[in-house]
Every structure is written in C-alpha cells, then in structure tokens.
Amino acid sequence: MTLRNFKWRNLYLWLVFIVLYAPIIFLVVYSFSQGTTMNNFHGFTWQHYQDLFADSRLIAIFLDTILIALLSSLLATVIGTLGALGINSTTKPITRNTLLSLNNILMVSPDVIIGASFLIFFTALKIPLGFGSVLLSHIAFSIPIVVLMVLPKIQEMSTSLLDAAADLGANNWQLLSQIIVPYIMPGIFSGFFMALTYSLDDFAVTFFVTGNGFSTLSVEIYSRPVKVSTWKSTPCPV
C-alpha cells in the first residue's frame, strides 16, 4: 500500500512539472524554427535570436526593466523590513490587525484597479509618467510582499535572545544589527527575490504608469503583437 501511494505521488508530481514547464519548453523549441507560426517546425535557424540581439530598443528596454526590478526590490526590502519590525513592535492587537489589513490591500486588489489608482494619483500630483512613476509603483506593490515574508520570521524569534543581549550591555543598534537582522535574513532574502519576481513579471500596473517614451519588457512584449495584429487587420485603401 505504501509503495502504491508513493508511485501515485511521483506520477502526480511529474504531471505538475509537465504542466508547468511544457509551455516554456515549447516556446524555446519553436524559437529556433524558421517559420513565423508555431503550428509546425520549419527547420532550425538562429535568425530570430540574431534579430533579437540586433534590436537596440529591445536591449535598452531589457536593461531598464532589470534596473527597475533591482531598485524597486532593494528599496521595498528595506522599507518592508522596517515595516515588519514596526508591526511586530505594536502591543495593541487592534493596531496590529489594522496595519496588517492596510498592508494586504495591495495584495488582494486587482492589478487593473491598482494601476488606474496610481495613474490618477500621479496625474493629480503632476508627476510625469516614466521611469520614476514605474519605480514608485513597483516599490509600492512590492512592500506588502516583503512584509509578509519578513514578519513571520520576526515572530519566530525568541525574546530571550534580545533580553540576553540587553543584559550583556547591547544597545538598540547592536540588537538590530547583530541579532535581529542576522536572524531574519532568510525572510529578508525571500522578500527581496519575491519582490524582484513580481517586478519583472508585472504588466497591468506598469501598463498604466509607463507613459510615452518609456517601457518595460512585459509591456513591450505585449504591445508588439498588438501592433502587428492591428497592422494586419487594417484594410488597404482602394
């Protein structure tokens, strides 16, 4: 009975991996096809990759996307870690629950609503849309992710560690830098990489706040097929 259950679990695990990775493998394989569609493989070619690396605009957009992701993730990690420490330090349950609820608003809100809200906010404050607006938006929706990653690690930490360090003469800065931060570092790294992933993956929020002359990789990838399909569907003048 145990062997049978083990085999079924392995089969289920393999099915999950196939569902997750088969589309990616499919895209990679057909990226080497000479054809322009993904119906049939028309022969091996490097042409698509040559065109990709020859596209200076796309390379610049890729670098901007990486820069946005790294900056927003780093700043969101710092702010989110401080926020998690602040939430954990509150003594009143009502205050703590209120702060957690406010933190989770961006997590449960639809991306379209968040993007439209940021657009209205930046327009009202006359903040130009571009690199700065995208960076601020990515920081804002990444902070709750970092808080949710760091806060459980803080709550796991025993207060006896802090009490012992304080009894040995450690000040507040030493408690933070030498005890708290090293202990919660796994949560900080998890929050950073989660924020980095969300920033690289985001499309809906970024689409609203990019403005003219600036784009990220996800927005560019979406807009190019739209432009091609629009051009093909436009009737020729007679």
What residue spans do the PLM features occupy?
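Amphipathic cytosolic juxtamembrane alpha-helices at the membrane-cytosol interface
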Residues: 2-4, 67, 91-100, 157-190
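Transmembrane alpha-helices
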Residues: 11-12, 17-24, 147-150, 157-159, ...
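N-terminal, non-cleaved signal-anchor transmembrane helix
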Residues: 1-56, 60-63, 67
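Transmembrane-helix boundary motif in ABC transporter permease subunits
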Residues: 1-5, 71-103, 120
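Membrane-interfacial helix termini and adjacent extracytoplasmic/periplasmic loops
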Residues: 46, 112-141, 173, 209-212
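Hydrophobic alpha-helical transmembrane segments of multipass integral membrane proteins
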Residues: 59, 63, 67-79, 83, ...
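Interhelical loop and adjacent transmembrane-helix boundary motif
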Residues: 3, 36, 48-57, 200-238
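Membrane-embedded alpha-helices of multi-pass transport/permease systems
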Residues: 22-25, 29, 78-82, 116, ...
